[in-house]
Amino acid sequence: MKEQKLTTENYKGTRDFYPEDMRLRNYLFSVMKDVVRSYGYEEYDGPMVESLDLYRAKTGEEIVGKQIYNFIDKGDREVAIRPEMTPTVARMVAKKLRELPRPIRWFSIPNLWRYEQPGHGRLREHWQLNVDMFGVTSSRAELEILSLACDILFAFGAPKNSFKVTISHRSLLDEFLLDGLKVSPNQAHEVSKILDKKNKITQDEYVALVTKTIPNDSSAVSKIDLFLNATVNSLNQIPGIKEETLAAIKGLFEDIKTIGLSDIIHFDPSVVRGFDYYTGFIFEIFDTSPQNKRSLYGGGRYDNLIGLFSNEELTGIGFGLGDVTLQNFLTAHNLLPNFASDTTVFIPLLDDSSFAENHNFAKELRKEKISAEVSLVSQKMGKQLSYAEKKGYRWILLRGEDEIKTNTVTLKDMASRNQFTFSFSEALQKIKEELSK
């Protein structure tokens, strides 16, 4: 009976990263890290597996109930593969709360898991830049986070009109629903979930869900629509909104003018965000391209996460940017560069007697931080050149019979197809000069 072979397909909703894919991923990570480090943020990481209770506390019903990967470990503990990073960073900060200098500025790019239907911009495993600041209560923290979030896209070459930022405040919706519409806390919670998915359902479905949730108010839909269309200046006409909340929103938008982003940052009370831990300002960044018109990433202020672990509260604010949505954005706006191979110099082996000297040449190149691969098998020149071309090598460093006689090397530039005969030191200098351009 023929042995059944294992499938070569990867698990649904995940990706295999071949070398060319890793070049793209490393590029995305490198640009993001450069930007956040320029703001003074430090990198951290945490475990992929956490206690399930960590996510039950504040992550949100849909993720914990339907999307989380959880299991019972061999010690009979309920654990989960992390679906997000904010609960982990809050736990880590709380663990060393008295030792850490404030404000705390941290970032990480973890891989996260959610069991959901894969689609455009959505996979079961993805990597996400998480940026968090702890210990600053003033709206200057919002200004820094918003500026940083925009600077990441600018660093990839995104023009200002390629994305927009929408901002609201978590208290707005709560105050409107509880004090304006006079609904119960449970009804308010259900309405917020409906609004969070409003753009993903039809208008009829939206009306039906609101009517079912608030059956005793026939004008609930029109009142909610009035709220959703409010501007900063018309918010005082919405019932239930407190003066303190109004002042905070107006103050933030006055401050936004000072950082030169008022043309792309807009007020939008429909911004909800699905996590239960947000308590203050919340924001979403949207792609404006018709080919990729969707939310790219978002974040907000959370004031009660540290208190889950400690008697001391510490305010936090942050955002998360996924690699899949970022790549889709860069593709839609034609912002991805052509990635050349990391490989630089290939040294063919034409005769076994040359191997030791070729090996020594490669060592000298590597000392200069120039990657070099030495052929280990003596083969026909055409076959070795074909291999080097497929691998994307920039230069071929060749030592045939003529070069051995004259103690020289032939350096072939695979980009221009030009070749030169030098001493090895001259060839090394030529490569260094070209790499520095």
Curated annotation (Swiss-Prot):
Can you state which reaction this protein catalyses? tRNA(His) + L-histidine + ATP = L-histidyl-tRNA(His) + AMP + diphosphate + H(+)
For this UniProt entry, which segments traverse the membrane? Answer: none
Gene Ontology molecular function terms on file: ATP binding; histidine-tRNA ligase activity
**Superkingdom of this entry's organism?**
Bacteria
What EC number(s) has UniProt assigned to this enzyme? Answer: 6.1.1.21
Could you list this entry's UniProt keywords, alphabetically sorted.
Aminoacyl-tRNA synthetase, ATP-binding, Cytoplasm, Ligase, Nucleotide-binding, Protein biosynthesis
**Cellular component per GO, a single term:** cytoplasm
The record ties this protein, via InterPro entries, to: aa-tRNA-synth_II (IPR006195), aa-tRNA-synth_II/BPL/LPL (IPR045864), Anticodon-bd (IPR004154), Anticodon-bd_dom_sf (IPR036621), His-tRNA-ligase (IPR015807), HisRS-like_core (IPR041715), HisRS/HisZ (IPR004516), HisRS_anticodon (IPR033656)
Q: Name one Pfam family in it.
A: HGTP_anticodon
Per UniProt, subcellular location reads as:
Cytoplasm
**Which processes are annotated in GO (biological process)?**
histidyl-tRNA aminoacylation
The similarity comment for this entry is: Belongs to the class-II aminoacyl-tRNA synthetase family.
Instruction: State whether it acts alone or in a complex, and with which partners, per the record.
Output: Homodimer.
**Name of the protein in question:** Histidine--tRNA ligase
